[in-house]
A protein has these predicted regions:
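Class I S-adenosyl-L-methionine-dependent methyltransferase catalytic core
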Residues: 1-143
Length: 143
């Protein structure tokens, strides 16, 4: 069972798309990621970009923990359906879903906009494609 582990939506259950295309991040891993972020940078009031969002669990966790706004980017229709349900469950008004490939989103993303980025790309994504996206991503990050 995937759930929000901390913050205002703590304990709310999330749906995960059926099939093998989405690999939900475990509660333990999410807890470690956010504990590290919070200790080092803080999450309160930040803008977060979640690429390859899957179920949206990572971005929604950020929203629950106080992120100002979150953009979830996911191209798969079944994953987007799960994300929409999870957005309703969490109820954060400033979480948006961009139903497109990460590379497409990054091409038109605003410059100097995001404080934090979460990216959990599929295993089969080629290294060169990831490198190109990272270069494009740099432009969207605040210093």
């Amino acid at each position: 069972m995937t759930r929000i582990i901390a913050g205002v939506a703590r304990g709310r259950k999330l749906v995960v798309p059926k099939g093998e295309d989405t690999r939900p991040t475990s509660d333990r891993a999410r807890g470690a990621i956010f504990s590290s972020w919070d200790a080092r940078f803080g999450i309160e009031g930040t803008t977060v970009l979640d690429l390859f969002a899957g179920s949206g669990a990572l971005g929604l966790e950020a929203a629950s923990r106080g992120a100002e706004s979150v953009v979830l980017v996911e191209p798969a229709p079944s994953a987007c359906a799960a994300i929409r349900r999870n957005m309703e469950t969490v109820g954060h008004p400033r979480v948006t879903l961009a139903e497109m490939k990460a590379s497409t989103y990054l091409t038109g993303a605003p410059e100097d906009h995001f404080d934090r980025v979460i990216a959990d790309p599929p295993y089969e994504l080629a290294g060169e494609a990831v490198t190109e996206m990272l270069a494009e991503l740099r432009r969207t990050l605040r210093d």
